[in-house]
From Swiss-Prot:
Biased composition (Low complexity): 903-916, 979-1004
Segments crossing the lipid bilayer: 26-46, 71-91, 120-140, 183-203, 212-232, 261-281, 293-313
HAMAP family: UPF0182
Protein's UniProt name: UPF0182 protein Noca_1530
Region (Disordered): 1-20, 899-924, 974-1004
Compartments it resides in: Cell membrane
Organism whose genome encodes this protein: Nocardioides sp. (strain ATCC BAA-499 / JS614)
Organism domain of life: Bacteria
Highest classification ranks of the organism: Bacteria, Bacillati, Actinomycetota, Actinomycetes, Propionibacteriales
Length: 1004
């Protein structure tokens, strides 16, 4: 090739100066050092990554990713380099040997003389640099490539092109990339060829005629022909994009797309093919007239047909009757969206909530509300830390988790926090490399509290600045104090060391040089000692340090020479890194969208982090697109840095995978949860053996799997609009709902809550994830939505919506305002506010109770002037219909609401069988006991009346109803007298409540 690139004998020129040689040598040395350092860093990252994957049993994932990316880099990089290099070479090879003398050519002589000595190097360098850019870009397309290669059928077709949905999800993105790549290569090659032709006289811009040589015209015509042909392929693919593009009233095909944009794409496709043929013909005809006309026609058609004509159709055909025109398209969008987000089978029931509780419903309400979680996972975090932290270098998450355990035969909800290592709490003098990475290596244990239970004395102390009164009213299920072992009883004990967690250090070096070496890793202090014990990690997690080469690689990766210098690093050491559970799942399954909230569970004697993994796409035809972050942006959402695939905008979502990460060993296990999901099937084909079958999930693990919050939030966001199935109503926004704003966090959605609620059509309660809707841009309540969150249930994942009538049932914001402005509540809160305490409102819970809706909200108190203060559960507010009750406990609040005692107390005297006397006898005992006795007699009379009616004895039925009414009226009269005397049962103004500790009933 070099002889072809020689134009004239080279002039050796004057001898080079020694100074310039030294400068050149220094520059070359610096470049070599920089390249060597970057190469070593890159290699160290790849090498240690391979060690990490292999140690975790996912070496096949590393191999697949590495070779896929490598092949894409070299294949597409070589394609760009080859096409550009060949075109540069051809442009130079067929340069004109005679160049007419002109000012233009005389000016270009300087550039030709400068380029001539380095022509070959310049050609190779330009081709390689452009190839490297193209190859690097291709690496980012590995997901599309693997999906295209391993994609399968969805089993259904779109409504317009009758293509399997798999074509849009698996094939279309990769085909788009191939066409875009081809167009980019042709554009770069065209520019490169044109520059070379211009430099060497093949293109002469300042001559009046023959501005292009024959070779230049032929080469440029061929490149333009292929480019326009690629554009035709792009128009063909663009047709299919119409079913997943947004920007209109819906995502997907609209009337304008169907009647203007789609025909325009077909016409432009045909014009592009004709234009390409004209460019190819121009190789022989040597005239630019026909190609220029074709290119001009394509450009004008693109403007007229692609932009102006759709605008005319939209403005003059669609706008005057848009609802009717768009109705068929909206109908298809509704059907596709409900399918893509899996909300097509939501059970919607009309629900007309009662506004008052019946006289005989007190015990039923008490039973149904016994499992209401009063311990707010967000607010009690400080209480967890100050009471169970033990040392400043331990911490728990900002928002705690809720899970359920079988404790003493009862299904109980617990608020859980993992006691993780938080190195920011270490003393400044202890913060050296040895301590940070070999001594302070792990956390210890789980802290657990009953979600629905108060401390035994049933009161709280808020007058001590350190809040030591009753540990925030919390009843511990697992902690550091003696006797708090309910979780241990439920699980049979467990490995409590936490080496992998949400707050774990970047890396730790663990392991002893010999079995007789001293343990140096600091463990949780032992009972009765102020000093922590020591331990040594003996799990199989992550990579072994090994010999000098591995130590050098880790030293390079982390920029830390102590890997080579410290005596704590030995051949038996392991390096624990990539320790965040969600990050570990992302790394072994880089095709998953990972849930933002991993939660801990004790399973088979180990602490596991459970993480939900989703398959998402933005290519599901006709389904509505929305930002994933927007849909899950509630008041508890934290920035995690986790990615949403393929983009933040999605229009399809499935909880395809349940993943676990062992908090001690770091072992990651993926289980196929939705085995019918075609996207999961494609990834299992791409990475065989990495995802276990659903049947491999143990019973103990299954007990702790739950419906994921991110999925529920996405579904509730979409269902707020897509519960409307009539196209005209949908277009007009009739009956549109929205997720309410959190009353205490402006601009954020109210988060969903995990509650035990009545099962659909059953008598038992089920563990559910719940939320509410309000009408669009209004504040009253529209509906209550829940989903069965119990993975062991046959009804798992079944969503139920209780749709309220249009009357003004107050929504969360309105209820929060009613609580704050209620005279009795406001007066009581003002009293302890004046004493230096500050009220903090907990979760505002909504739950269906006794054919109505009850709001429950805990109120915490914290010392306003104390930095060490943490919220203490002080009051509970309840609302049913128009009535508000409050008290120190939920039972007290219900008593205050109902005007009766719901718990055990003084037993009423034996008054005989109902019906012995129509006039109720004078009751004895306390007023509350009298009321209970009267209501019990009334309930007995109602039962007797029902039995008489069943037997057809109308006379007895009427007599028993009279007795019941007399007892109810007497009870109401006593309640009114007690209220006027200012003695509400359970009033928080008392120093202590008379009711016993609140112990929840079995919930299932």
């Amino acid at each position: 090739m070099s002889e072809l690139f020689d134009e004239a004998p080279r002039d050796p020129g004057p001898p080079a100066r020694s100074g310039s040689r030294r400068s050149r040598a220094l520059i070359v040395t610096a470049v070599v050092l920089v390249i060597g350092f970057l190469g070593l860093s890159t290699f160290a990252g790849i090498y240690t990554d391979r060690l990490w994957y292999v140690s975790g049993g996912y070496g096949a994932v590393f191999t697949t990713l590495f070779w896929t990316k490598t092949v894409l880099f070299f294949l597409f990089g070589a394609g760009m380099a080859l096409v550009v290099g060949v075109n540069i070479y051809l442009a130079y090879r067929f340069r004109p040997f005679f160049r007419p003398n002109s000012p233009e050519q005389n000016g270009l002589d300087r550039y030709r003389e400068a380029i001539n000595p380095i022509r070959t190097w310049l050609l190779v360098g330009v081709a390689l640099v452009l190839g490297a850019f193209a190859g690097s870009s291709a690496i980012g397309e590995w997901r599309d490539y693997l999906l295209w290669r391993n994609g399968t059928s969805f089993g259904s077709e779109d409504a317009y092109f009758q293509k399997d949905i798999g074509f849009y999800v698996f094939d279309l993105p990769w085909l788009h990339y191939l066409v875009d790549y081809a167009m980019a290569v042709l554009v770069v090659a065209l520019i490169a060829a044109a520059v070379v032709h211009y430099l060497y006289g093949g293109i002469r811009l300042q001559t009046p005629r023959d501005r292009l040589s024959g070779a230049a015209q032929a080469q440029i015509s061929v490149l333009l022909g292929f480019f326009v042909l690629a554009k035709a392929a792009d128009y063909w693919l663009d047709r299919f994009d119409l079913v997943s593009q947004g920007g209109g009233v819906i995502t997907g095909m609209t009337y304008t797309d169907d009647h203007a944009v789609l025909p325009a794409k077909n016409i432009l496709l045909g014009i592009s093919i004709i234009c390409a043929v004209l460019f190819f013909v121009n190789v022989w005809r040597r005239t630019w007239l026909l190609p220029s006309v074709g290119l001009a026609l394509l450009a004008v058609s693109a403007i007229l047909l692609g932009l102006i004509w759709p605008g005319i159709v939209q403005q003059f055909q669609v706008k005057p009757s848009e609802a009717d025109k768009e109705a068929p398209y909206i109908e298809k969008n509704i059907e596709a969206t409900r399918t893509a987000y899996d909300v097509a089978n939501v059970d919607v029931e009309k629900y007309d909530p009662a506004t008052a509780l019946g006289a005989g419903s007190a015990s039923m309400v008490e039973e149904e509300t016994s499992s209401v979680p009063l311990v707010d996972p967000q607010l009690v975090r400080d209480a967890f830390e100050q009471n169970q932290q033990v040392r400043a270098y331990y911490s728990v998450a900002q928002v705690l988790d809720v899970d359920r355990y079988d404790i003493d035969g009862n299904d109980r909800a617990l608020v859980l926090g993992v006691r993780e290592l938080d190195q920011s709490g270490m003393n400044a003098g202890d913060r050296n490399w040895t301590n940070l990475h070999t001594v302070y290596t792990h956390g210890n244990g789980i802290i657990a509290a009953f979600a629905n239970q108060r401390s035994e004395d049933n009161k709280t102390q808020i007058d001590n600045a350190d809040n030591t009164g009753d540990q925030a009213g919390i009843v511990w299920a697992q902690g550091t104090n003696a006797g708090q072992d309910a979780l241990a009883r439920a699980t049979g004990g467990f490995e409590d060391r936490i080496y992998y967690g949400e707050q774990s250090p970047q890396y730790s070096v663990v392991g002893k040089a010999t079995p007789d070496s001293t343990d140096v890793e600091l463990n949780l202090q032992t009972a009765g000692s102020d000093e922590g014990s020591t331990t040594t990690y003996d799990g199989n997690g992550d990579a072994s340090v090994g010999g000098f080469f591995n130590q050098l690689m880790f030293a390079t990766k982390f920029g830390e020479p102590n890997f080579l210098l410290s005596g704590r690093v030995n051949p038996n050491s392991k390096v624990l890194f990539n320790r965040n559970p969600a990050d570990r799942v992302e790394k072994v399954a880089p095709w998953l969208t990972v849930d933002s909230d991993p939660y801990p569970a004790v399973v088979d004697g180990r602490i596991l982090w459970i993480i939900d993994g989703y398959t998402t796409t933005d290519r599901y035809p006709l389904s509505e697109k929305e930002s994933f972050q927007t849909m899950i942006d509630d008041s508890l959402q934290e920035e995690t840095g986790l990615r949403t695939l393929p983009t933040d905008e999605i229009n399809y979502m499935r909880n395809a995978v349940k993943a676990t990460v062992d908090a001690y060993t770091g072992d990651v296990t993926l289980y196929a949860w939705d085995e019918e999901d075609p996207i999961l099937q494609a990834w299992r084909s791409a990475f065989p053996g990495t995802v276990e079958d659903k049947s491999e999930i143990s019973d103990d693990l299954l007990d702790h799997l739950r419906y994921p919050e991110d999925l529920f939030q996405v579904q509730r966001y979409q269902f707020a609009r897509y519960h409307v199935t009539e196209p005209i109503d949908f277009y007009q926004g009739n009956n549109r709902w929205q997720v309410p704003e959190d009353p205490y966090s402006k601009g954020k959605f109210q988060p969903p809550y995990r509650l035990f609620v009545d099962s659909n059509g059953g008598t038992d309660q089920v563990f559910a994830l719940t939320s509410v809707y309000v009408p669009y841009n209004k504040n009253n309540l529209a509906s209550f939505v829940s989903v069965n969150a119990d993975a062991t249930s046959d009804q798992y994942g079944q969503m139920q919506v209780l749709e309220l009538p249009n009357e003004q049932t107050p929504g969360p914001g309105q209820v929060a305002n009613q609580f704050a402005t209620d005279p009795e509540v406001a007066n009581e809160l003002a009293q302890f506010n004046r004493s230096g305490a500050r009220p903090v409102y907990g979760n505002l819970l909504t739950l269906p109770i006794n054919d109505g809706l009850m709001y429950v909200q805990p109120v915490y108190a914290t010392q306003a002037l104390s930095d060490s203060s943490f919220p203490i559960l002080r009051y509970v507010l309840v609302k049913y219909g128009n009535d508000i009750g409050f008290g120190s406990t939920l039972r007290d609040a219900l008593e205050n609401l109902l005007g009766v005692s719901t718990g055990p107390g003084t037993q009423p005297p034996d008054t005989g069988q109902p019906g012995d006397n129509e006039n109720p006898p004078p009751a004895t005992g306390t007023v509350a006991a009298q009321i209970r006795a009267l209501l019990a007699q009334a309930q007995d009379a109602f039962d007797a009346a029902d039995a008489a009616l069943a037997d057809g004895n109308l006379a007895e039925y009427q007599r028993q109803i009279g007795i019941a009414q007399a007892n109810v009226e007497a009870a109401m009269e006593l309640g009114q007298k007690r209220g006027s005397a200012g003695q509400p049962s359970g009033s928080p103004s008392g120093s202590a409540s008379s009711s016993p500790s609140e112990s929840p009933s079995p919930s299932s």
